[in-house]
């Protein structure tokens, strides 16, 4: 293990100041087709099923208009042409603060709610079939996100601000548990807790906000360790295999959408932060990685960590991004980007 870690550490300087070509792409205008009077809030989640239907998890609330905190989650479905189909789980008990949505190989819809600490599995018809975690009682305080200091110890079977979900070839489920517990949880195909790994920290196998997760055809598990600015790779037992970072300098003309544009050490700390990830299907898989709010780009990355290309930059306009919080990639030339700061989903066609 010491030899492996030494190799990894020595490899990191070689990744500094990476260069990568810009990838030509088109962002489909006016996507998706929203019904009259309907708007998204912040959009932290997007997923695509095998029929090409797109699922959007929005921080919004139809009952009370603009929503924050304890009532900010709606799950929408659109068809393959971007037309509105339905809202799933309207008024669901688990809804508090939307964070991620994913579709498994059987078409089941998994929604991760950061505010309620819950993960909900719907069947393709939209019926709740599994629930993981538990939210605070209705009589508890209205503020869903509490941060006791020091944090309470992690508890098997429960979550604290979970972030994302993925599956291996054997039907096991992996959940990044996330802002507080700093770990990955493994659940078997029957829904039973198997194990977890990780604690808060900077060493290999530790995390500071494991924010995204994806699994390749060989059951390698990629965890976006956001605040450590790296992607760690594990086997299905949680054994550390390797890690890599993305260090492509932004366009000097780029400006942050919200707040002051980072410079100096602050800029170094946010370049390549893996806010979002997806892996394409098929035999020649690639990884797409969405950066945090700034510099706000999307990267095409080989599974060994080599950056193959850069998509877009920070901004408000079509083809620009801010808060690329989730990605869906049904192919290596079609990518969906969910943005929190820009309150939208973009459908990208890569050339």
Question: Residues of each region from the PLM?
Answer:
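Eukaryotic scaffold repeat domains enriched in small/polar residues
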Residues: 17-351
């Amino acid at each position: 293990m010491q030899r492996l870690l030494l190799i990894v550490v020595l490899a990191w300087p070689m990744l500094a100041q990476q260069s990568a070509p810009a990838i030509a792409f088109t962002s489909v205008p006016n996507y998706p087709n929203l019904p009259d009077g309907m708007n998204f809030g912040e959009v932290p989640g997007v997923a695509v099923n095998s029929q090409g239907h797109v699922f959007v998890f929005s921080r919004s609330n139809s009952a009370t208009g603009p929503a924050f905190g304890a009532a900010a989650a709606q799950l929408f479905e659109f068809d393959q042409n971007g037309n509105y189909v339905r809202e799933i789980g309207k008024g669901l008990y688990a809804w508090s603060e939307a964070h991620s949505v994913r579709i498994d190989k059987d078409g089941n819809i998994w929604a991760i709610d950061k505010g309620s600490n819950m993960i909900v599995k719907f069947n393709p018809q939209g019926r709740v079939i599994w629930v993981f975690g538990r939210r605070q009682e209705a009589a508890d305080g209205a503020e869903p996100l509490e941060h006791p200091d020091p944090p309470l110890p992690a508890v098997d079977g429960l979550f604290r601000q979970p972030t994302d979900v993925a599956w291996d070839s054997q039907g096991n489920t992996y959940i990044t548990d996330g802002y507080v517990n700093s770990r990955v949880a493994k659940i078997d195909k029957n829904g039973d807790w198997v194990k977890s790994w990780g604690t808060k920290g900077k060493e290999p196998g530790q995390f500071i906000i494991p924010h995204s997760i994806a699994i390749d055809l060989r059951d390698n598990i990629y965890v976006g360790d956001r605040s450590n600015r790296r992607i760690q790779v594990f086997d299905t037992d949680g054994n550390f295999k390797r890690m890599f970072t993305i260090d492509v300098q932004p366009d000097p003309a780029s400006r942050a959408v919200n707040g002051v544009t980072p410079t100096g050490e602050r800029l170094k700390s946010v370049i390549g932060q893996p806010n979002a990830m997806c892996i394409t299907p098929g035999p020649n898989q690639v990884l797409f990685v969405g950066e945090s709010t700034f510099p706000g780009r999307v990267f095409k990355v080989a599974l060994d960590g080599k950056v193959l290309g850069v998509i877009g930059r920070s901004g408000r306009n079509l083809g620009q991004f801010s808060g690329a919080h989730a990605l869906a990639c049904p192919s290596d030339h079609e990518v969906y980007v969910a943005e929190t700061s820009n309150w939208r989903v973009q459908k990208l066609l890569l050339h």
